[in-house]
Amino acid sequence: FRAAQCGFGYRRSVFRENPGRYLVVSVTYRLAAGVRGTVAYAELRKALGKSAAAAPLTDVYSTVLDHRRAKSMVIEADNPNRRSVGYFFVNPVLEARELADLSNRARSAGFEDLPFHPVGENHFKVPAAWLIERAGFAKGSRHKSVGISDAHALALIHHGGGTSAELVEFARQIRREVLVRFGIELQPEPVFVGFPTANPLSAGQSTE
């Protein structure tokens, strides 16, 4: 595949749109010296300040690395949160009616600060981490040999000596509590390999 054939976009690619068809075993990058990247991510633009549009790639690289390190998304031997696949659940995108229902549920539970931002016409993205923490799963929570990262509630981590069944069991607990409290069914972001179904978090599915 050449780059154009991969269909890369924000959280999308030809590989993601054809689950089970492809297995990526190697990647080759062609880099160019002296170019400037497009800085579109809001937190990154804020960190770079007024110079974001003209920032050298070295500055962008350092800022991205600092940003990811703060969320324990950099593999470092001395970081206990390093064993993860990144963010485990997808941030739900809701229609206006669904957002209103979620806001009402949140207020009824005593939460007035439901965060969201628009993503296209009549659709809004809600942080899954916010839902997870307010469903009773704080950062640093633990279940057997797995748990939630101390740095970000969306990252499920492995403390060592555990099994994939323990991880799926814990993810199911989180998913169930968010659904009961907020009426939102979180969807997993990673691809599951070696399970009977594509989504072992669904009720009634085996964890083996």
Model-predicted regions and their roles:
Residues 2-165, 181-208:
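Phosphate/pyrophosphate- and phosphate-bearing ligand-binding catalytic cores of soluble enzymes
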